[in-house]
């Protein structure tokens, strides 16, 4: 039985390793991702904002053994491999571990660089058409292509001069030196602000936020990582209620205390000014608020990503042509094994209603791998069907 994972980021790679650990042979696995190497987007984005440590603890990584990264850090003798009481792993160490595991499981041999143009069921198999017109036939598909497809650029910045989203394809490193203004309220904006401060000895950086700083250790309360909260959540029948809980429990636009304290230090030294005024417009190199017009050199946006989950052509095609079921809240109606259609599985945001507030981060990938593990065992026990 052949498995294809669409998306070679952290979650797709986590699931791929789980399948290989379960005994899936190398020639029965394909990973489709547009980047040249697996997990490249995460690595690129982390470097763009100079994030020294991950937000999640050291037990959250791509290998099935929760202590694998900790053991790796010890063997590799990383100095300052973790930070703080929650043992947040050093980003470079984390990525070193990722690359080691990708190499160990020969996942680069499974990687096809490209985009999926179409996905359809034909003669009992899934048929995947890529942007180069290559067609892949596979028995099982896992959608793990993430939620970071299109950076969110608020309307007032759409036509403004010298404005770029930090995660946009048009971004280049020369923009750091020209930028004194950052827009955003979360962890990416905080890291980016600190990067700009550290790149200059005297430049004053302006951080524009649309709310007070929200200090949270993690993306959501750790109770959502286990039965403490998830048992009740999974007993709720209403998809609308589940979605409401997820939106309430996710700490969107927040940052851990240590980041806040680093920002505070620069406020006190005069290197950082935080603005909480509502920005009315941006034009002629000026930021207009109700009180003032402040000139800017270059603005870097750290405003997150657009909610494009269900807008992807591949997803729309499955809904229209394969009758893929949706819940009342509009998200895929999936099983406890994250199965949307026969032998088509979800991870990340598409599995929100099963995985809860942590669905979209590293731990969500680990939980998705565990759910799909059960499906793999079930399908492997079935008689092999011959296709026409």
Tell where the protein language model's regions lie, with residue ranges:
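Flavin (primarily FAD) cofactor-binding/catalytic cores of flavoenzymes
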Residues: 1-35, 83-187, 191-388
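Coupling/switch segment of ABC-type P-loop NTPase heads
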Residues: 48-88
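Conserved N-terminal glycine-rich FAD pyrophosphate-binding loop of Rossmann-like flavoproteins
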Residues: 35-62, 215-230
């Amino acid at each position: 039985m052949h498995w294809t994972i669409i998306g070679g980021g952290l979650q797709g790679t986590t699931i791929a390793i789980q399948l290989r650990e379960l005994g899936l042979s190398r020639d029965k696995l394909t990973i489709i991702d547009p980047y040249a190497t697996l997990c490249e987007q995460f690595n690129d984005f982390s470097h763009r904002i100079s994030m020294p440590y991950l937000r999640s603890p050291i037990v959250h990584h791509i290998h099935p053994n929760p202590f694998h990264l900790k053991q790796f850090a010890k063997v590799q003798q990383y100095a300052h491999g973790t930070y703080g009481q929650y043992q947040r792993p050093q980003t470079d160490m984390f990525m070193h571990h990722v690359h080691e595991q990708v190499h160990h499981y020969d996942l680069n041999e499974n990687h096809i660089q490209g985009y999926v143009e179409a996905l359809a069921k034909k003669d009992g198999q899934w048929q995947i058409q890529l942007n180069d017109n290559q067609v892949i036939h596979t028995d099982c598909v896992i959608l793990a292509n993430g939620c970071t497809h299109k950076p969110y650029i608020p309307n007032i910045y759409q036509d403004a001069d010298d404005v770029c989203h930090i995660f946009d394809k048009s971004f280049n490193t020369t923009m750091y030196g020209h930028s004194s203004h950052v827009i955003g309220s979360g962890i990416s904006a905080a890291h980016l602000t600190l990067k700009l401060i550290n790149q200059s000895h005297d430049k004053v950086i302006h951080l524009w936020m649309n709310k007070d700083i929200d200090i949270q250790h993690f993306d959501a309360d750790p109770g959502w990582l286990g039965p403490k909260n998830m048992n009740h959540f999974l007993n709720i029948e209403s998809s609308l209620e589940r979605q409401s809980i997820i939106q309430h429990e996710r700490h969107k636009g927040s940052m851990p205390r240590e980041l806040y304290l680093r920002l505070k230090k620069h406020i006190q030294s005069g290197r950082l000014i935080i603005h909480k005024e509502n920005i009315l417009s941006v034009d002629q190199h000026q930021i207009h608020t109700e009180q003032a017009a402040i000139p800017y050199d270059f603005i870097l946006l750290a405003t997150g990503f657009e909610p494009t989950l269900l807008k992807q052509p591949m997803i729309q095609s499955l809904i229209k042509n394969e009758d893929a079921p949706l819940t009342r809240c509009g998200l895929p109606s999936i099983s406890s094994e994250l199965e949307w259609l026969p032998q088509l599985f979800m991870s990340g945001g598409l599995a929100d209603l099963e995985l809860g507030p942590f669905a979209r981060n590293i731990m969500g990938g680990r939980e998705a791998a565990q759910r799909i593990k059960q499906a793999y065992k079930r399908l492997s026990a079935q008689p092999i069907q011959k296709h026409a």
